Swiss-Prot record:
<keyword id="KW-0694">RNA-binding</keyword>
<dbReference type="InterPro" id="IPR000630">
    <property type="entry name" value="Ribosomal_uS8"/>
</dbReference>
<dbReference type="InterPro" id="IPR035987">
    <property type="entry name" value="Ribosomal_uS8_sf"/>
</dbReference>
<dbReference type="GO" id="GO:0003735">
    <property type="term" value="F:structural constituent of ribosome"/>
</dbReference>
<comment type="subunit">
    <text>Part of the 30S ribosomal subunit. Contacts proteins S5 and S12.</text>
</comment>
<dbReference type="InterPro" id="IPR047863">
    <property type="entry name" value="Ribosomal_uS8_CS"/>
</dbReference>
<protein>
    <recommendedName>
        <fullName>Small ribosomal subunit protein uS8</fullName>
    </recommendedName>
</protein>
<dbReference type="GO" id="GO:0006412">
    <property type="term" value="P:translation"/>
</dbReference>
<keyword id="KW-0699">rRNA-binding</keyword>
<keyword id="KW-0687">Ribonucleoprotein</keyword>
<comment type="function">
    <text>One of the primary rRNA binding proteins, it binds directly to 16S rRNA central domain where it helps coordinate assembly of the platform of the 30S subunit.</text>
</comment>
<dbReference type="GO" id="GO:1990904">
    <property type="term" value="C:ribonucleoprotein complex"/>
</dbReference>
<dbReference type="GO" id="GO:0005840">
    <property type="term" value="C:ribosome"/>
</dbReference>
<dbReference type="GO" id="GO:0019843">
    <property type="term" value="F:rRNA binding"/>
</dbReference>
<comment type="similarity">
    <text>Belongs to the universal ribosomal protein uS8 family.</text>
</comment>
<keyword id="KW-0689">Ribosomal protein</keyword>
<dbReference type="Pfam" id="PF00410">
    <property type="entry name" value="Ribosomal_S8"/>
</dbReference>
Length: 130
Protein backbone atom coordinates (compact mmCIF):
# COMPACT_ATOMS: atom_id res chain seq x y z
CA UNK A 1 0.00 0.00 0.00
CA UNK A 2 1.36 3.42 -0.92
CA UNK A 3 1.75 6.31 1.49
CA UNK A 4 -1.10 8.82 1.12
CA UNK A 5 0.55 11.86 2.76
CA UNK A 6 4.38 11.74 2.88
CA UNK A 7 4.64 15.18 4.54
CA UNK A 8 2.34 14.15 7.41
CA UNK A 9 4.50 11.03 7.76
CA UNK A 10 7.62 13.22 7.98
CA UNK A 11 6.08 15.43 10.68
CA UNK A 12 4.89 12.37 12.63
CA UNK A 13 8.38 10.85 12.52
CA UNK A 14 9.82 14.10 13.93
CA UNK A 15 7.13 14.24 16.65
CA UNK A 16 7.59 10.57 17.62
CA UNK A 17 11.39 10.77 17.47
CA UNK A 18 11.48 13.68 19.89
CA UNK A 19 8.94 12.03 22.20
CA UNK A 20 11.27 8.99 22.36
CA UNK A 21 14.40 11.21 22.76
CA UNK A 22 15.94 9.88 19.54
CA UNK A 23 19.11 11.51 18.20
CA UNK A 24 17.98 11.24 14.58
CA UNK A 25 15.06 10.04 12.46
CA UNK A 26 15.15 8.68 8.90
CA UNK A 27 12.55 8.74 6.15
CA UNK A 28 12.29 8.40 2.37
CA UNK A 29 13.57 11.60 0.73
CA UNK A 30 11.86 13.98 -1.70
CA UNK A 31 12.55 17.53 -2.89
CA UNK A 32 9.71 18.94 -0.77
CA UNK A 33 10.87 17.10 2.38
CA UNK A 34 14.42 18.43 1.86
CA UNK A 35 13.05 21.97 1.42
CA UNK A 36 11.01 21.64 4.65
CA UNK A 37 14.06 20.23 6.48
CA UNK A 38 16.11 23.19 5.25
CA UNK A 39 13.55 25.66 6.66
CA UNK A 40 13.48 23.78 10.00
CA UNK A 41 17.30 23.89 10.16
CA UNK A 42 17.46 27.62 9.31
CA UNK A 43 14.89 28.37 12.03
CA UNK A 44 16.77 26.25 14.61
CA UNK A 45 14.20 23.48 15.08
CA UNK A 46 16.59 20.68 13.98
CA UNK A 47 20.39 20.36 14.24
CA UNK A 48 21.11 19.18 10.70
CA UNK A 49 19.95 16.91 7.90
CA UNK A 50 21.62 14.76 5.26
CA UNK A 51 20.59 12.68 2.28
CA UNK A 52 22.03 9.18 1.88
CA UNK A 53 21.66 6.63 -0.93
CA UNK A 54 21.46 6.95 -4.69
CA UNK A 55 18.68 4.72 -5.99
CA UNK A 56 16.34 5.22 -3.02
CA UNK A 57 17.49 8.37 -1.21
CA UNK A 58 16.92 8.49 2.56
CA UNK A 59 16.61 11.76 4.47
CA UNK A 60 18.11 11.74 7.97
CA UNK A 61 17.19 14.56 10.38
CA UNK A 62 19.28 15.20 13.50
CA UNK A 63 16.82 16.30 16.18
CA UNK A 64 17.57 19.20 18.51
CA UNK A 65 17.14 19.31 22.29
CA UNK A 66 17.65 22.13 24.82
CA UNK A 67 18.29 21.20 28.46
CA UNK A 68 16.93 17.72 27.82
CA UNK A 69 13.65 18.96 26.28
CA UNK A 70 12.69 18.81 22.61
CA UNK A 71 12.99 22.13 20.77
CA UNK A 72 9.86 21.36 18.70
CA UNK A 73 6.93 21.73 21.12
CA UNK A 74 4.30 21.09 18.48
CA UNK A 75 4.35 20.35 14.77
CA UNK A 76 1.02 20.22 12.96
CA UNK A 77 0.05 19.47 9.35
CA UNK A 78 -2.33 22.09 7.95
CA UNK A 79 -2.82 21.63 4.20
CA UNK A 80 -3.36 17.97 3.38
CA UNK A 81 -4.10 16.01 0.19
CA UNK A 82 -7.87 15.96 0.84
CA UNK A 83 -8.11 19.63 1.84
CA UNK A 84 -5.51 22.04 0.50
CA UNK A 85 -5.20 25.35 2.38
CA UNK A 86 -3.96 28.38 0.42
CA UNK A 87 -3.60 31.92 1.77
CA UNK A 88 -2.80 35.26 0.15
CA UNK A 89 0.06 37.38 1.46
CA UNK A 90 -2.24 39.46 3.67
CA UNK A 91 -3.96 36.33 5.09
CA UNK A 92 -0.80 34.50 6.24
CA UNK A 93 -1.20 33.28 9.84
CA UNK A 94 1.04 34.08 12.80
CA UNK A 95 1.73 30.92 14.81
CA UNK A 96 1.66 31.45 18.59
CA UNK A 97 1.56 35.24 18.06
CA UNK A 98 4.82 35.14 16.10
CA UNK A 99 6.75 32.75 18.39
CA UNK A 100 6.26 29.77 16.05
CA UNK A 101 6.50 29.49 12.28
CA UNK A 102 4.23 28.46 9.45
CA UNK A 103 6.02 26.60 6.64
CA UNK A 104 4.62 27.82 3.33
CA UNK A 105 5.11 26.55 -0.22
CA UNK A 106 5.21 29.58 -2.53
CA UNK A 107 6.03 30.10 -6.20
CA UNK A 108 9.56 31.05 -5.06
CA UNK A 109 10.03 27.87 -3.00
CA UNK A 110 9.36 26.69 0.55
CA UNK A 111 9.80 29.39 3.23
CA UNK A 112 8.53 30.63 6.58
CA UNK A 113 5.51 32.89 6.97
CA UNK A 114 7.85 35.80 7.86
CA UNK A 115 9.90 35.36 4.67
CA UNK A 116 6.73 35.05 2.56
CA UNK A 117 5.32 38.23 4.11
CA UNK A 118 8.56 40.12 3.37
CA UNK A 119 8.60 38.81 -0.21
CA UNK A 120 4.91 39.68 -0.64
CA UNK A 121 3.96 36.09 -1.48
CA UNK A 122 1.12 33.80 -0.54
CA UNK A 123 0.92 30.05 -0.98
CA UNK A 124 0.01 26.67 0.44
CA UNK A 125 0.38 26.39 4.23
CA UNK A 126 2.18 23.09 4.77
CA UNK A 127 2.49 23.04 8.57
CA UNK A 128 2.81 24.98 11.82
CA UNK A 129 5.89 24.52 14.03
CA UNK A 130 6.23 25.88 17.57
Amino acid sequence: MSMQDPIADMLTRIRNGQAANKVAVTMPSSKLKVAIANVLKEEGYIEDFKIEGDTKPVLELELKYFQGKAVVESIQRISRPGLRIYKRKDELPKVMAGLGIAVISTSKGVMTDRAARQAGLGGEIICYVA
